[in-house]
Regions:
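Short metal-binding segments enriched for Cys and/or His
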Residues: 29-44, 91-107
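A broadly conserved sequence feature marking short terminus-proximal activation segments
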Residues: 18-57
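Short, solvent-exposed interaction modules
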Residues: 50-96, 101
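Short amphipathic alpha-helical linker/capping segments at the junctions of internal repeats
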Residues: 43-57, 105-121
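Short cysteine-rich clusters marking metal-coordination/redox-active sites
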Residues: 3-6, 23-26, 64-67, 87
C-alpha cells in the first residue's frame, strides 16, 4: 500500500492485536477504525465515534490508500488545529504523526494516544 502523501510503499507494523501501515518518509499512519478504537479504549479514551470533531467538507484531503476514495478531514480542538482524515468507503483512518523513521509499534501507539487526548480538548 502506498502513502497517500508521499506515494512510497508504507511498512506494516503488527502489534499484539493491532496492525497498521506507516510511512517512513512522512510518518503518516493508516489504521483500521477497529484497531484505532482498541488503542483508544485501552488508554482510557472514548471510541472514535464519541470523540467529537467536525467534518471539514471544504478541504480536499488525500485519497485513501486502501480504496482510492477522497478522505474526509475531521477537525477537533480548534486551539491546536488537530485533525485526522477518514474514508467514507472503507472506514480507514489517516493520521499525520511526528515519528522517528525507526519508530516501533509502541512509539506509534503512544503518538496516537497523545493526538487523541489533545483532540478532545
Amino acid at each position: 500500500m502506498d502513502c497517500p502523501r508521499c506515494n512510497v510503499e508504507m511498512e506494516s507494523l503488527e502489534g499484539e492485536d493491532i496492525s497498521l501501515q506507516r510511512c517512513a518518509e512522512c510518518s503518516g499512519v493508516f489504521i483500521d477504525p477497529g484497531d484505532l478504537n482498541r488503542i483508544l479504549l485501552r488508554n482510557g479514551l472514548p471510541v472514535l465515534e464519541r470523540l467529537g470533531g467536525k467534518a471539514n467538507l471544504e478541504e480536499i484531503a488525500v485519497t485513501c490508500p486502501e480504496c482510492s476514495v477522497d478522505l474526509t478531514v475531521v477537525e477537533g480542538n480548534d486551539k491546536l488545529g488537530l485533525r485526522y482524515e477518514t474514508c467514507e468507503s472503507c472506514g480507514g483512518i489517516w493520521l499525520d504523526l511526528e515519528l522517528d523513521e525507526d519508530a516501533d509499534m509502541q512509539t506509534v501507539e503512544t503518538a496516537i494516544v497523545e493526538l487523541f487526548r489533545q483532540f478532545r480538548g
